[in-house]
């Protein structure tokens, strides 16, 4: 048996063990254990299906090779072997991709944060446009989007939007969106038809629990104040808005979308934990960068990753030199897979 076949056999064995464990009374009565084992089984389900098929093809190849000695069946066996060898090769390619080490955060939900950068009102308008594209993409993927916090500007755009996106494989696909997105287009208010360039930043932060990020309460500075509306007018007569600052890192989160101070504090704390976890990921990636090829998806907010040129209907993905002349269609349909799939393929190729 080859090394690959042995590896796949052990994966199948573990999958069968998990199936048995998940139907045992002991595990069913332990929610934590049940969730843990279910996640493990789910993580190897795809590779298990491919493994079963691959091992079956190997068995068929072995049988047909034996039939080559039979004069009556040798020609039929030769034809069958051609088909089987092609199938074996295709399965090996797919299995190698499935065996690439998984990012431990790939199955997590995310906090998506979009912030207007240079370019004034135009940047704020593009925050709204790109957020709509992400929402359409989420619809295509059957993900759930919940706006956690938003700050509008005076022309119908946004200074900032933070949303929680839940669903299968959210982080695995959207992690490549982190960075600076540049937009080039003629603003509606531009009478001379001049193209303006503006930029926004996108952050992708995995949703984390208390076990993954533990915060010492003494490291937090919590301030409460009255929520303000547009132009600074007061929209709440009580001190319901909350600002939490993590003193060791000086990372700060403000929240005023809810009328309840308790709810604002809870939301702010969750986002703070996500930002601290994002910082951990960035530091780990920097430490690992010296030991491996540079990978797409560093998550650095300052890295200019993409340009959206509306006059040319062009989307340029700078990290992999990808150019698509279907910008408007992608933005309106939300079919970001046209950009994300090549990014994933490039990231996977770094392991080969």
Swiss-Prot record:
Belongs to the prokaryotic/mitochondrial release factor family. It comes from the Bacteria. The lineage of its organism: Bacteria, Pseudomonadati, Campylobacterota, Epsilonproteobacteria, Campylobacterales. Methylated by PrmC. Methylation increases the termination efficiency of RF1. NCBIfam families: prfA, PRK00591.1. The modification N5-methylglutamine is found at residue 233. GO terms for cellular component: cytoplasm. Its main location: cytoplasm. It comes from Helicobacter pylori (strain G27). It is found in: Cytoplasm. Residues 288-309 are annotated as: Disordered. Pfam families: PCRF, RF-1. This is Peptide chain release factor 1. PANTHER family: LD18447P (PTHR43804:SF7). Residues 289-306 have a biased composition (Basic and acidic residues). Keywords: Cytoplasm, Methylation, Protein biosynthesis.
């Amino acid at each position: 048996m080859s090394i690959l076949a042995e590896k796949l056999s052990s994966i199948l064995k573990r999958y069968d063990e998990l199936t048995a464990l998940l139907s045992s009374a002991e595990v069913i009565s332990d929610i934590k254990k049940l969730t843990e084992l279910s996640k493990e089984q789910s993580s190897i389900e795809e590779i298990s299906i491919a493994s079963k098929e691959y091992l079956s093809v190997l068995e068929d190849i072995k049988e047909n090779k034996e039939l080559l000695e039979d004069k009556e069946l040798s020609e039929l066996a030769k034809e069958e072997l051609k088909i089987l060898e092609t199938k074996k090769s295709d399965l090996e390619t797919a299995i190698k991709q499935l065996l690439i080490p998984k990012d431990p955060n790939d199955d997590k939900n995310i906090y998506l944060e979009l912030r207007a950068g240079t370019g004034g009102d135009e940047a704020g308008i593009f925050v709204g446009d790109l957020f709509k594209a992400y929402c359409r993409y989420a619809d295509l993927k059957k993900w759930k989007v919940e706006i956690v916090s938003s700050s509008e500007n005076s022309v119908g755009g946004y200074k900032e939007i933070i949303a929680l996106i839940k669903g299968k494989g959210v982080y695995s696909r959207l992690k490549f969106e982190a960075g600076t997105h540049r937009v080039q287009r003629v603003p509606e208010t531009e009478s001379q038809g001049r193209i303006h360039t503006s930029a926004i930043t996108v952050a992708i932060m995995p949703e984390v629990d208390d076990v993954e990020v533990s915060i010492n309460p003494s490291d937090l500075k919590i301030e409460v104040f009255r929520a303000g509306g547009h132009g600074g007018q007061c929209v709440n007569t009580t001190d319901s808005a909350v600002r939490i600052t993590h003193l060791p890192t000086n990372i700060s989160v403000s929240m005023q979308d809810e009328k309840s101070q308790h709810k604002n504090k809870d939301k702010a704390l969750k986002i703070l934990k996500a930002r601290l976890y994002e910082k951990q990921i960035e530091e780990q990636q920097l430490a690992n960068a010296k030991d491996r090829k540079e990978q797409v998806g560093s998550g650095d907010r300052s890295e200019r990753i993409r340009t959206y040129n509306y006059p040319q209907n062009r989307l340029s993905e700078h990290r992999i030199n990808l150019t698509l002349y279907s910008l408007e269609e992608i933005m309106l349909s939300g079919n970001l897979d046209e950009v994300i799939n090549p990014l994933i393929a490039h990231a996977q190729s770094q392991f080969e």
